[in-house]
């Protein structure tokens, strides 16, 4: 998590909310897709939910493949896909006590 957003707001924390069955289905589908498309042996994705603060790790991605280039390409794809398409709802809390739901992930 970054300390500022695209508007340069000073972010104190963020809450990530999700609907468990929908998000689990989405992640499972993404894993199956990248395993097939990037010829991976297997992939693991874990995404934080709940309250996070700047510098917290939000995502862990691990891939197994015959060649590391396949994994590097797959991880890049996964991170971009999660950022733009994952069914996660984000609410930012700012240092000036404002709060706002994130409408678009950039």
What are the functions of these language-model segments?
Residues 1-57, 64-106:
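N-terminal, polar/charged subdomain of small-to-medium soluble alpha/beta proteins
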